């Protein structure tokens, strides 16, 4: 693709059959809705946008913010002419059913991280497009079946990260032209970055494998990884993912012992599946700690899952620690500064 090529031009040339045309239509519609959402976020209180609760609760039990509701409305309106069988939204208790013969279904989180609005932090939109098989219940396939996935980051610039199953491209919103333009193509997760992201305040609730990995990072040059690490925690899934695509590293949102966190906190259909698809398409990896995220099959619309994503070597190390409890003690003396291979 040419640098600066518009997203609409890419989508116009994508696919020749009904399913791929529907994928292009869905991505284009979500992109159009995201421009409206970006404008609303940019105006903030001037447009009546705040992080104040709207009063109702969404399907996840979170109190909806005003912008959650408006973002949901924008996406539903944008998708009205897209041939879909079902929509699964973070903001809806039930599926929104369309044409059962349509070639695709779509899952999305219209505004991920809306609690960040009042503090002027990054928020985003996440989406996943999957094939629909008439006669088969929607959203019952593993994440590896996704046709397209991506997310929009509403930050200093509004950027759209997209995979159509053949690599990852990043587009940035040209506000004057109200269109997305390509800025990076065939993005690859940097392999060797000394950064990890986790909410360290929950240390006492983590499983031992997570503690072991973080302890390895904290040990720095004296530890088994033989390098100093920086910890990042933005509290915004889309921002964490964008940073990893740009700088590498690993993000952990594990299951833990707190009530309601035993299966993780992020939702499979519209958070962990699309993020995992993007990461793998960019040469990274994504796991629950014990299972590849793209092998997970959701049994309910809002099923939760742990998510560990980023540079493959770090994700694989965390998986090793989960699957082999002896891995932590076996590795530490071999590679530490004062271990077998260092003096």
Swiss-Prot record:
Its cofactor is Mg(2+). One of its GO terms (cellular component) is cytosol. Keywords: Calvin cycle, Carbohydrate metabolism, Cytoplasm, Hydrolase, Magnesium, Metal-binding. InterPro entries: FBPase_C_dom, FBPase_class-1, FBPase_N, FBPtase, Fructose_bisphosphatase_AS. Pathway: Carbohydrate biosynthesis; Calvin cycle. Mg(2+) 2 binds at residues 109, 112, 271. GO terms for molecular function: fructose 1,6-bisphosphate 1-phosphatase activity; magnesium ion binding. It catalyses: beta-D-fructose 1,6-bisphosphate + H2O = beta-D-fructose 6-phosphate + phosphate. It comes from the Bacteria. Signal peptide: none annotated. Binds 2 magnesium ions per subunit. Belongs to the FBPase class 1 family. Homotetramer. This is Fructose-1,6-bisphosphatase class 1. The gene is fbp.
């Amino acid at each position: 693709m040419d640098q600066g090529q518009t997203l609409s031009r890419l989508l116009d040339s994508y696919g020749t059959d009904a399913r791929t045309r529907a994928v292009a239509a869905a991505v284009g519609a979500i992109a159009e809705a995201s421009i409206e959402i970006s404008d609303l976020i940019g105006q903030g209180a001037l447009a009546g946008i705040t992080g104040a609760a709207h009063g109702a609760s969404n399907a996840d039990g979170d109190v909806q913010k005003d912008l959650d509701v408006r973002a949901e409305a924008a996406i539903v309106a944008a998708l009205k002419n897209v041939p879909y069988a079902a929509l699964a939204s973070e903001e809806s208790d039930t599926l929104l059913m369309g044409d059962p013969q349509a070639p695709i279904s779509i899952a999305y989180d219209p505004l991920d991280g809306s609690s960040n609005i009042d503090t002027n932090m990054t928020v985003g939109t996440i989406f996943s497009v999957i094939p629909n098989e008439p006669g088969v219940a929607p959203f019952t396939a593993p994440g590896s079946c996704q046709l397209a996935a991506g997310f929009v980051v509403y930050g200093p610039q509004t950027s759209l990260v997209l995979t159509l199953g053949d690599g990852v491209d990043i587009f940035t919103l040209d506000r004057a032209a109200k269109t997305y333009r390509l800025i990076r193509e065939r993005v690859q997760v940097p392999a060797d970055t000394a950064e990890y992201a986790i909410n360290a305040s929950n240390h006492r609730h983590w499983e031992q494998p997570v503690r072991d990995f973080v302890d390895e990072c904290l040990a720095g040059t004296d530890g088994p990884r033989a390098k100093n690490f920086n910890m990042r925690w933005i509290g915004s899934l889309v921002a964490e993912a964008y940073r990893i695509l740009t700088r590498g590293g690993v993000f952990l949102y594990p299951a833990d012992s707190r009530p309601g966190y035993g299966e993780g906190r992020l939702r499979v259909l519209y958070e962990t599946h699309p993020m995992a698809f993007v990461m793998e398409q960019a040469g990274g990896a994504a796991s629950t700690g014990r299972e590849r995220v793209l092998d997970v099959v959701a049994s309910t619309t809002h099923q939760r899952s742990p998510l560990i994503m980023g540079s493959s070597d770090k994700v694989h190390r965390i998986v090793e620690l989960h699957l082999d409890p002896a891995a932590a003690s076996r590795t530490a003396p071999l590679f530490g500064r004062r271990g077998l291979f260092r003096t």
